[in-house]
Amino acid sequence: MSTVAPPADQAADVLKKLSLDSKSRTLEIPEPTKKTGVYQYGAMDSNGQVPSFDRSLSPMLPSDALDPSVFYVPNVYQQPYYYGYGSDYTGYTNSESVDMTSGAYGENASLVYPQGYGYAAFPYSPATSPAPQLGGDGQLYGAQQYQYPFPLTASSGPFASSVPASTQSKLSTNKAANSASAGIPKGMNGSAPVKPLNQSALYGNSALGGGLAAGYQDPRYSYDGFYTPVSWHDGSNFSDVQRSVSGSGVASSYSKANNNVPATRNQNSSSNSHYTSMYQPASMTGYAAQGYYDRVSPNKSYGQYGSTVRSGMGYGSSGYGSRTNERGWLNTDNKYRSRGRGNSYFYGNENIDGLNELNRGPRAKGTKATEEVSSEEVKKQTFDESNTEETVTCVLPDREECNRDDFPVEYKDAKFFIIKSYSEDDVHKSIKYNVWASTPNGNKKLDAAYQEAQQKSSGCPVFLFFSVNASGQFIGLAEMKGPVDFNKNIEYWQQDKWTGSFPLKWHILKDVPNSLLKHITLEYNENKPVTNSRDTQEVKLEQGLKVVKIFKEHNSKTCILDDFSFYEARQKTILEKKAKQQQSQKQVWEGKTNDEKPGTVDSTM
């Protein structure tokens, strides 16, 4: 058994075997670089803490991800602009006079990336982005103060706005109608301050029903009381202001001014949840000055889940409000009208009063006028034309007399033209008064054709195929019976811009769908179908005879005569409306004339 060395000797042994280097080495450990986390609305520190949501901050996007021709939205969802939705980008400015016309950012004018799910529209390009905003006048607008939309998911507690109203506007309230809604006790007259419409401060007990909470501005009406052109909902339409929508989508978190019990949010899942992000503080300076959320991308641009695909694709009442037609402008004159698509409540391009152009009458929905109008009931009417009174004879044609079986369909020589009317109201008046008027160029074209036809000894009638824009059908065949009188203006057209007139006679009155005529192409119109023609488009003899034959042989169950009483009532209402407008304009003009008389002193000086 070997002896064990003492511990002191063992320690000395170990020390001898150790080899020491001449240079000391330090352990090199790379220090971790602090990486800034990317957050949707700004920067996030290394601890994962998200900074407070501040409106003064700008979004942080990586520099290599920016393209001068691309507009990057906060939620990174990019939507194309070329789907035909450019009509929602209208020429308006916000309260800071920043142009909001163009839907294109940067150099590429064919693309724009509007917001995707649930975000309001932006009037500015991102503050840190080099992409300039291209205005409608061709000017480039630099980065402005960035404005964030309200978050989609609202807080559980009551929302208190930190944005003060820009102006303390006051509206005089009606003691009978407005005193109660403004929180003023009955019997008191005066004015009440208008509160801004904040997020989720919508309506009473449901999303769109029961009226607004007291003291808040109704977003469906502009500051002057007119119905707003912007449709704020994409679901079922409502035909009355006080009518509620079934199934509350977003309840108000505000307590009414005359109620101490605050309303609670609806915790149930609803497809209308994206409404919360579209309502933001609004002042009473008018819709043209309410900022970025109304005119650029109104809520009607978004579908049920916030995408840019409209429900109904623009047709039917699901895409537009039942009181408006697409933009739904309330026009005070007849010269400039919106030519939008119709909805299920009206029959065509109607406005709030329902008196704009109709491309089809009630018969298009399978209903006919309940009252039949006879020729005796159509009385003579007198119109003031160039300070001379002229009596116009109105004769209602008989249906069988117009659609005669012996009407010839073969002609050795004849001229044919397509007439595109803006409304059936004008066609109704043409049938009633046996007269028509086209555009200045159209009148010249038709008059030249008629003068040329009259010089032919063998006879050459000039036929007109009538169709209303966007109606999908032709409605009749008429013949010119005289030259165009360029100095004779008729006042009973739907619009006041038509000048000149010429007499005609109606031969066929029936609804002929375009599907029966699409196979006929026109050499004068790049071989396009006859159904794709402009006003006063000339048709060659061969194609014209084919159209006449189809008109005669088609067995139609409806024609414009079915809606004659309907258009008679509309004409009366339109004339009354025009008379009131003229009277109002006359009063305004007389007031201006009195103010401009010598000797009057301006009170503002």
From Swiss-Prot:
**Which residues participate in RNA binding?**
420-422, 426, 436-437, 469, 493, 498, 506
Annotated Gene3D superfamilies: ph1033 like domains
Q: Can you say where in the cell this protein is located?
A: Cytoplasm
Known CDD domains for this protein? YTH
Q: Where is it chiefly localized?
A: cytoplasm
**Function noted in UniProt:** Specifically recognizes and binds N6-methyladenosine (m6A)-containing RNAs, and regulates mRNA stability. M6A is a modification present at internal sites of mRNAs and some non-coding RNAs and plays a role in mRNA stability and processing. Required for the correct timing of leaf formation and normal leaf morphology.
Can you name this protein? YTH domain-containing protein ECT4
Q: Which organism is it from?
A: Arabidopsis thaliana (Mouse-ear cress)
Gene designation: ECT4
